[in-house]
């Protein structure tokens, strides 16, 4: 069986942000899906319940007159024994007006913002009255909203598993990585490139690993470096960051940065973090 969440509510109350949060939690998400095709879409999901195990769809006032058939859709779900939960996102009129003013966006119903809000409340009442959960986002931060959704959706994902940590080794001679959140330079380590027999090896090779680990400054550095990263990651999780890229660079991106990245990845995995490792320049061999 699939886990289905129907996201609805007032425009400007956080539906789009909520759908992004569901997506970060691994849900298959569809925004503003027409009511007429929801049943067919769910049938597709049921045929591949492994791939579509967790599904979140957004239905709102943009559906127009088709919203009149929303309750009929719920009857279809019940007949097919499809479990679902409707989450309605709401906010006070004053907060909605302020958010529209800040973003300078038009109301989707094409009226003035105040008129649009008033009309939308009438239209969305048919969903509001059948909602399983109503979330007032007037005073919620993004982090708080994420916690509320994780509880409502019964997502037992630890913060460590929520944060996707990418560790990237690179060579400065080929340029800085564009997507790095943190960049650390390990060119202070004696370069194995100039040691006989190590030039065409990489930081993955045992001989290179032993050469670097014998350097006292590396041991001191890595103890401090790993503790620094371990100390800061919970803060990123607290601030609701779902992706973090740590880039480690040396001259050519083959020896020192590769070994350090490998060692950091192993350290974080031992601490139960979800880690992806990539060596950008490991295959480049300039003479």
From Swiss-Prot:
Entry's transmembrane regions: none
GO MF terms, alphabetically ordered: ATP binding; GTP binding
Keywords for this protein: ATP-binding, GTP-binding, Nucleotide-binding
InterPro entries tied to this protein: P-loop_NTPase, RapZ-like, RapZ-like_N, RapZ_C
Highest rank taxon of the organism: Bacteria
Annotated family: Belongs to the RapZ-like family.
Keyword Iron in annotation: no
This protein's name: Nucleotide-binding protein TGRD_433
Species this chain originates from: Endomicrobium trichonymphae
Residues bound to ATP: 9-16
Function comment: Displays ATPase and GTPase activities.
Positions with a binding annotation for GTP: 60-63
HAMAP family on file: RapZ_like
């Amino acid at each position: 069986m699939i886990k289905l969440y129907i996201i609805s509510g007032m425009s400007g109350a956080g539906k789009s942000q909520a759908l992004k949060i569901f997506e970060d939690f691994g849900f298959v998400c569809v925004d503003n899906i027409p009511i007429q095709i929801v049943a067919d879409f769910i049938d597709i999901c049921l045929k591949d319940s492994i791939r579509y195990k967790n599904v979140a769809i957004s239905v709102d006032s943009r559906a127009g007159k088709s919203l009149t058939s929303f309750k009929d859709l719920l009857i279809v779900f019940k007949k097919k024994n499809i479990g679902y939960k409707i989450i309605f996102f709401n906010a006070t009129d004053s907060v909605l007006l302020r958010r529209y003013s800040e973003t300078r966006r038009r109301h989707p119903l094409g009226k003035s913002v105040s008129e649009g809000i008033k009309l939308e409340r009438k239209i969305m009442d048919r969903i509001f009255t059948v909602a399983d959960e109503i979330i007032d986002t007037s005073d919620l931060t993004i982090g708080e909203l994420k916690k509320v959704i994780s509880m409502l959706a019964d997502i037992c994902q630890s913060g460590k598993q929520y944060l996707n940590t990418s560790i990237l080794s690179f060579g400065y001679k080929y340029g800085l990585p564009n997507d790095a959140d943190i960049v650390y330079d390990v060119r202070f380590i004696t370069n194995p490139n100039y040691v006989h027999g190590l030039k065409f090896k990489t930081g993955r090779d045992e001989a290179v690993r032993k050469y670097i680990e014998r350097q006292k400054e590396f041991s001191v550095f890595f103890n401090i470096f790993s503790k620094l990263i371990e100390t800061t990651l919970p803060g990123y999780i607290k601030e609701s960051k779902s992706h973090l890229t740590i880039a480690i660079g040396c001259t050519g991106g083959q020896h020192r940065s590769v070994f350090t990245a490998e060692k950091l990845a192993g350290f974080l995995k031992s601490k139960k973090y979800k880690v992806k490792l990539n060596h950008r320049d490991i295959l480049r061999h300039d003479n």
